[in-house]
């Protein structure tokens, strides 16, 4: 997710009070079949069938599913929106979701389930029979949820409907337990494996649809339109609805779409997306999907990435908007194709996306920003922030913390986005551009559709450069690096 621009945050820092799938061998993927209907009053009724393949090395007696929409309910322990952004996110006043699980069955047999987790964020489904490694089971979940009116991943505004993280998705299983992180307001607190999706989405007929994957069918009926959508080997599925105009173009063989409702220069946004897919594909490895869609919507932050789909806030225009499009497109490689635990290792996709954005301006022509200027701005902003940070009695500049361990979105943004990009630039300067780029390509190829760990990136860079780089990475990650301005 793209936070507010670094230059804007640097100014804000001055006013702080004195105290932001499977890889390797081929394995069968799980599949989600979703049949959802959105009413005119923004109530979503859906049936999700998860044909779950146990790609873990241990047998399972139950499955856990994230219930992300529950985080928007009244009384939630954790709000998806930071306390200091509530007014911006809810301009019409606070609005809550209401989620109801109507029924759950496993292989056709009804099950008594439990909603648990730290914040009623987990659906626990007993399987009955043990599910051994490589075996498959089918879990059917019928539910309904009233969407909140909020400028966020899941919710609606006067101009659009965001369906991000709207369905029960299987929890990852790691180190002998299901990963059940709640919906923290800092960062993007998600972690999922790649799967196949077949989605039927029926919505009021005024809406056009932007979605992960390909829209393979569109059927109109009285006051409604039904979209058939397919996506293979993607880490998540999301959709955005609105009264959109659409432009499309090609980046190589990839169809690139831009959907918008308020843009005086839509061709610039489309071209930024096309250029990003082309440059990142050349520098990192080929974009693996047939289509990529950028969509304008009501959103609190600058943008939000989903596989083959990027939400871009309608609050931005001009060069700032183009910069956000580039950042979110970079996430198609770092998060979308190469996955990571976004709670524990958030720098692994955000720092990579931010530095990729800087590099974009090295190879693209006709844009306001340059690589050197972006790098200089990042260094100046980070040094200024750290000076203010120290004056406020804080000295932890480590990047190894989970997203909920940062004191604020501002601290998170500087440590993960800004410092993370500077770290990667230091690695590049240490090994040289040619070997650095070779390391990025190796990292992408080795971890495509899988879950990467920090050591995977370090290892790819070490193999490409034939140098020991772990101490360099760790000095940045652990907060030992000290940065100084040349001025």
Residue spans for each PLM region:
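Extended, low-hydrophobicity, Ser/Thr/Pro/Gly-biased non-transmembrane segments
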Residues: 87-102, 139-238
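Beta/coil-rich, acidic/histidine-enriched accessory regions frequently appended to metallopeptidases
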Residues: 448-487
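Ligand-binding face of N-terminal immunoglobulin V-set domains in extracellular IgSF glycoproteins
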Residues: 45, 49-71, 75-76
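Hydrophobic helix-coil surface modules that form long, contiguous segments used
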Residues: 188-326, 355
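N-terminal, polar/Ser/Thr-rich
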Residues: 12, 20-45
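Zinc-dependent metallopeptidase catalytic helix centered on the HExxH motif
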Residues: 267, 312-381
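Acidic/His/Gly-enriched intrinsically disordered linker/tail segments
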Residues: 350, 354-422, 430, 447, ...
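Solvent-exposed beta-strand/loop surfaces of large extracellular or lumenal domains
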Residues: 24, 73-127, 214-220
């Amino acid at each position: 997710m793209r936070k507010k621009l670094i230059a804007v945050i640097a100014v804000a820092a001055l006013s702080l009070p004195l105290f932001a799938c499977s890889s390797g061998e081929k394995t069968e993927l799980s599949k989600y079949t979703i049949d959802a209907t959105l009413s005119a009053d923004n109530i979503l009724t859906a049936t999700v069938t998860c044909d779950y393949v146990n790609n873990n090395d241990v047998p399972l007696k139950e499955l856990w599913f994230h219930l992300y929409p529950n985080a928007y309910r009244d009384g939630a322990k954790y709000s998806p929106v930071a306390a200091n952004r509530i007014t911006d996110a809810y301009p019409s006043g606070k609005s809550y979701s209401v989620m109801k699980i109507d029924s759950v069955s496993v292989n056709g047999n009804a099950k008594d389930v439990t909603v648990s987790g730290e914040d009623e964020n987990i659906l626990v489904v007993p399987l009955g029979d043990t599910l051994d490694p490589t075996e498959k089971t089918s879990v059917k979940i019928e539910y309904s949820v009233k969407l909140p009116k909020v400028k966020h991943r899941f919710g609606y505004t006067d101009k659009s409907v965001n369906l991000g993280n709207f369905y029960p998705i299987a929890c990852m299983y790691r180190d002998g337990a299901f990963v059940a992180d709640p919906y923290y307001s800092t960062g993007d607190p998600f972690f999922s494996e790649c799967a196949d999706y077949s989605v039927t989405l029926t919505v009021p007929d005024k809406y056009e649809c932007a979605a992960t994957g390909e829209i393979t069918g569109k059927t109109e009926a009285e006051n409604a339109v039904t979209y058939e959508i397919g996506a293979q080997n993607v880490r998540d599925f999301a959709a955005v609805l609105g009264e959109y105009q659409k432009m499309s173009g090609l980046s190589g063989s990839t169809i690139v779409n831009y959907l918008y409702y308020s843009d005086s220069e839509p061709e610039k946004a489309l071209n930024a997306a096309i250029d990003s897919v082309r440059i990142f594909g050349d520098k990192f490895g080929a974009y693996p999907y047939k289509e990529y869609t950028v969509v304008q919507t009501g959103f609190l932050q600058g943008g939000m990435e989903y596989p083959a789909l990027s939400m871009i806030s309608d609050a931005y225009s001009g060069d700032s908007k183009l910069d956000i499009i580039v950042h979110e497109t970079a996430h198609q490689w770092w998060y979308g194709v190469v996955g990571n635990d976004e709670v524990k290792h958030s720098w692994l996709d955000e720092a990579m996306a931010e530095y990729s954005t800087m590099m974009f301006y090295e190879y693209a022509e006709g844009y306001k920003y340059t690589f050197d200027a972006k790098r200089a701005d990042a260094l100046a902003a980070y040094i200024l922030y750290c000076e203010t940070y120290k004056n406020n009695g804080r000295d932890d500049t480590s990047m190894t913390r989970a997203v909920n361990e940062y004191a604020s979105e501002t601290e998170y943004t500087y440590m993960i986005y800004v410092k993370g990009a500077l770290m990667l630039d230091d690695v590049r300067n240490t090994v040289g551009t040619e070997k650095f780029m070779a390391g990025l390509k190796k990292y992408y190829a080795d971890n495509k559709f899988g879950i990467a760990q920090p050591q995977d990136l370090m290892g790819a860079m070490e193999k490409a450069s034939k140098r020991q780089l772990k101490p360099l990475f760790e000095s940045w990650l652990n907060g030992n690096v000290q940065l100084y301005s040349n001025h």
